[in-house]
C-alpha cells in the first residue's frame, strides 16, 4: 500500500491570482515584464528572474506591498474545508511555494501550520528588496528553481509514497514530473497534456477533494487508516468486556460521496482480532466489495441511517448489563434523564446544571421497523439512543468522540444503578 503525499503550490493555486504578478503590476517599473517573459520562456531561471523582479522594488515599500497583497489576495473556494478534510483523514499535506514569507504565512495562518509550509524569504534591510532562498535545488535538480519543489518532494517522500502535486504554473512543472498524479489548472494543465503526465483538471478545491477521493491509491490508504482506527476502538471496548456473546457492532465512515463505511462483520467474536473483523458497506448497507463471504452486522441499517441523516463519522452499538437494565427501568417513560454529574461535560454540555436525556425506543426483531423508529431520534452530529433490552447506539463526528460519549453514558448508567441500589438498601 502506498501512502499519499500531497504537495500544493500557493500562488495561483491556493489563491485565485498569482500574488507575485499582482505585486509587480502594482509596484514595479516596466522592466519586470521582460523578466517575467524570460521566466515563462525558460530563458531565465525562476530564481534569477524572481530575484531580479523583487530587486526592482524599494525596501521602503514593505508596508505598502504587504498591506496591498493581504488585502487583494483571495483564497480559492473550498480550500479551508479541503485542509480540514485532509487533517481528518490523516493525509500528509505540505504547501511548497515560490512565493514570499511576508504574504504566504499570514494568508495561511490558522489553516496550515508553518511547519508544513516551504517558501522563500524576502529581506527588506537593503535599499531594494532582496530574496533569500532557503530551499535551493539539490544535486538532483539543476534548474535553479529558487524554492525547489522537486528537491523538497525528494526530502519529504518515503520510498513507496504516492505523490500528488497540485499546481497551476511554470514553477510547478518540474514537481509535476516527480509526481504520480498532478492535479492541475491553467499553464500547468497544458504542460501536463503536452508531456503526457498523469493528471486531472481542477477548478477549485472541491474538485481537488473529489479527485483525491476517486483516486485508487488514496482511497485504499484512507480505508486502511479508518480500519486501523476502528480496530483500536474495538480493542478498547473488548477490554471492557462490552461485546458479550458476539453482540454489538461498530462502524466508521470512509467516504461521503458515495457513502462507504466499514462495519463489523456479523457473528464474529469481537474480543478477538482477525483480518476479517470489518467489511466495507455501501449507502444501502450492502457489502461494497466482492471476494469474501462476510456479512454486515444485523443492525447495519441503523448505521446507514446515522450516516445518511447526520454528519457523524463513527457509530457504536454495545450491549451491557447496565444499559439494558436502564432501558428496562425507564421504558414506560421512553427516556431517561441525568443531571448533576461532572462527566456530562464529556457529552459537550458545559453548563453548571446541565442535564442530558437519552431516548428509549422499543426493540423489534424486524430491523426496518426498528430503524424507522430509531431514525426519528437522529438529530445533530452526535447523540445516543437506548433500545429496550437491546443496548445503546452512540454516534459522533469522529471515532474518538463516539467512544468518549459511549464511555460517559455507560458511566452514568452504572452510577445511576448503584445509587438506586444504595438508596433502596438504606430505606
Swiss-Prot record:
A single GO BP: L-methionine salvage from methylthioadenosine
Self-association and partners: Homotetramer.
Pathway of action: Amino-acid biosynthesis; L-methionine biosynthesis via salvage pathway; L-methionine from S-methyl-5-thio-alpha-D-ribose 1-phosphate: step 2/6; Amino-acid biosynthesis; L-methionine biosynthesis via salvage pathway; L-methionine from S-methyl-5-thio-alpha-D-ribose 1-phosphate: step 4/6
Cofactor descriptive note: Binds 1 zinc ion per subunit.
Positions of region (MTRu-1-P dehydratase): 222-427
Cross-referenced InterPro entries: Aldolase_II/adducin_N (IPR001303), Aldolase_II/adducin_N_sf (IPR036409), HAD-like_sf (IPR036412), HAD-SF_hydro_IB_MtnX (IPR017718), HAD_hydro_PyrdxlP_Pase-like (IPR006384), HAD_sf (IPR023214), MethylthioRu-1-P_deHdtase_MtnB (IPR017714)
Cystines in this chain: none
Keyword Hydrolase: yes
EC code: 4.2.1.109, 3.1.3.87
Catalytic activity, reaction form: 5-(methylsulfanyl)-D-ribulose 1-phosphate = 5-methylsulfanyl-2,3-dioxopentyl phosphate + H2O; 2-hydroxy-5-methylsulfanyl-3-oxopent-1-enyl phosphate + H2O = 1,2-dihydroxy-5-(methylsulfanyl)pent-1-en-3-one + phosphate
Sites where the protein binds Zn(2+): 317, 319
Protein name: Bifunctional enzyme MtnB/MtnX
Record's keyword terms, sorted: Amino-acid biosynthesis, Hydrolase, Lyase, Metal-binding, Methionine biosynthesis, Multifunctional enzyme, Zinc
Cofactor names: Zn(2+)
One GO MF term: 2-hydroxy-3-keto-5-methylthiopentenyl-1-phosphate phosphatase activity
GO cellular component: cytoplasm
Family: In the N-terminal section; belongs to the HAD-like hydrolase superfamily. MtnX family. In the C-terminal section; belongs to the aldolase class II family. MtnB subfamily.
Summary of the function given for this chain in its UniProt record: Catalyzes the dehydration of methylthioribulose-1-phosphate (MTRu-1-P) into 2,3-diketo-5-methylthiopentyl-1-phosphate (DK-MTP-1-P). Dephosphorylates 2-hydroxy-3-keto-5-methylthiopentenyl-1-phosphate (HK-MTPenyl-1-P) yielding 1,2-dihydroxy-3-keto-5-methylthiopentene (DHK-MTPene).
Region (HK-MTPenyl-1-P phosphatase): 1-221
